Amino acid sequence: MIQYSSKFNNAKVLVLGDVMLDRYWFGATNRISPEAPVPVVKVQGIEERAGGAANVAMNIASLSVPVALHGLIGQDDAGRALDKLLNSHNIQNHCVALDSHPTITKLRILSRHQQLLRLDFEEGFHHVASDSLLAKLEQEITAYGALILSDYGKGTLESVQQMIQVARKAGVPTLIDPKGTDFERYRGATLLTPNMSEFEAVVGHCKDDDEIVEKGLKLIADFELTALLVTRSEKGMTLLRPNQAPFHLPTQAKEVYDVTGAGDTVISVLATAIADGRPYEEACYLANAAAGVVVGKLGTSTVTPTELENAIHHREETGFGILAEDELKRAVEQAKQRGEKIVMTNGCFDILHPGHVSYLENARKLGDRLIVAVNTDESVKRLKGESRPINDLNARMAVLAGLASVDWVVPFAEDTPQRLIGEILPNLLVKGGDYKPEEIAGSQEVWANGGEVKVLNFENGCSTTNVIKKIQASK
């Protein structure tokens, strides 16, 4: 079974940005105030959590990864509360405490798991000299595998361009969750992680995935970025890089409880994985899995290694996901014993596009379980040429396994999956395109076992070749 690991043995991350304290008041609400048409909350519990850049650092620390935090706080109770929180999680707290400004604090009042009100206590740190932060960064940057600049628009990162240049000179990747529409500030960064609304505020409305890719690649070129990760809420996330195919990941969130701090979790896991030397695709997969966990929690939260491990192998525990051939045989046998109808299809799935997604959804509707057999990299080269595949086998299978319509993904090394289909013997064999049923590899084996063979149509205009042509045309 192909696995991603939630252990980051070689990672070390530095976080610099807008530090905040999140306070939560929890209580019961049973009546409306006689003074005004507002609920009366009887406070029954108070909780304090790290927010902003401090929450980013907490996310990294929760993964058992060494992390240091640089930022600005006040010499006040909130600042001392933050210091205590950070120290309790073994975070190196290098925040500068100022007597001229209070610590940025956000107070949320909740009842029955619903947020009723948020109160912000802040003056921000605009026009506060950040020379000390810059000097500290220059001294320490080479000791880290990644730098996160956590920008909430509160002023700590007024020297962000100089900070980026310090990291570039040291050869350390810089990741930024951007704020506002002035992306010129982030020129030369390694990776930006805007959400969809932030992305469209800069590039304009995008009517479809193709336009997201086109405008995203232009943004990368305009601001000399290495990569761009657009987080798209219920549509997952999209990784873009020059001269490489877009990497789309569907959301893994089962239930969205609270999105507070989800962006912090994404960039934390991304940076940690990159600092650990993981490929960008794997880093995004892990970040996506972590985000799916954290939005199921209340308030500013973190993800533990165990939670991340369970999330990235969430189907493994029930026999689903990416399986080796012998594991798939056992899973299919058990499913057949339960009376489930097994549907099977195959392909290269080099660059997953809407046509693929629609096709797989339609195939899944024809039965209870869907198996997708995927050509290995060498098999794709023999079929498509030396320039293919664009995405390697692990990346292609990871994306397919993330689709709700797909139950099992299995690789095969031959030019056709005929042998594999003969071993699995699905109840229904499905293929997309203009084939005649008798031309489909494995059809004879399925028919001989009393099964069915069906041809489904792809959406018009959707093809991997067309996607590649659009990418080449955008260069």
From Swiss-Prot:
It comes from the Bacteria. Residues 344-475 are annotated as: Cytidylyltransferase. Pfam families: CTP_transf_like (PF01467), PfkB (PF00294). The active site is at D264. ATP binds at N195, M196, S197, E198. One of its GO terms (biological process) is lipopolysaccharide core region biosynthetic process. Pathway: Nucleotide-sugar biosynthesis; ADP-L-glycero-beta-D-manno-heptose biosynthesis; ADP-L-glycero-beta-D-manno-heptose from D-glycero-beta-D-manno-heptose 7-phosphate: step 1/4; Nucleotide-sugar biosynthesis; ADP-L-glycero-beta-D-manno-heptose biosynthesis; ADP-L-glycero-beta-D-manno-heptose from D-glycero-beta-D-manno-heptose 7-phosphate: step 3/4; Bacterial outer membrane biogenesis; LPS core biosynthesis. One of its GO terms (molecular function) is heptose 7-phosphate kinase activity. One of its GO terms (cellular component) is cytosol. InterPro entries: Bifunc_HldE (IPR023030), Carboh/pur_kinase_PfkB_CS (IPR002173), Cyt_trans-like (IPR004821), PfkB_dom (IPR011611), RfaE_dom_I (IPR011913), RfaE_dom_II (IPR011914), Ribokinase-like (IPR029056), Rossmann-like_a/b/a_fold (IPR014729). Gene3D superfamilies: 3.40.1190.20, HUPs. Residues 1-318 are annotated as: Ribokinase. Its EC number is 2.7.1.167, 2.7.7.70. Keywords: ATP-binding, Carbohydrate metabolism, Kinase, Lipopolysaccharide biosynthesis, Multifunctional enzyme, Nucleotide-binding, Nucleotidyltransferase, Transferase. It catalyses: D-glycero-beta-D-manno-heptose 7-phosphate + ATP = D-glycero-beta-D-manno-heptose 1,7-bisphosphate + ADP + H(+); D-glycero-beta-D-manno-heptose 1-phosphate + ATP + H(+) = ADP-D-glycero-beta-D-manno-heptose + diphosphate. The keyword Nucleotide-binding applies. It is an enzyme of class 2 (transferase). Signal peptide: none annotated. In the N-terminal section; belongs to the carbohydrate kinase PfkB family. In the C-terminal section; belongs to the cytidylyltransferase family. Homodimer. NCBIfam families: cyt_tran_rel, PRK11316.1, rfaE_dom_I, rfaE_dom_II. Catalyzes the ADP transfer from ATP to D-glycero-beta-D-manno-heptose 1-phosphate, yielding ADP-D-glycero-beta-D-manno-heptose. HAMAP family: HldE. PANTHER family: BIFUNCTIONAL PROTEIN HLDE (PTHR46969:SF1). This is Bifunctional protein HldE. It comes from Actinobacillus pleuropneumoniae.
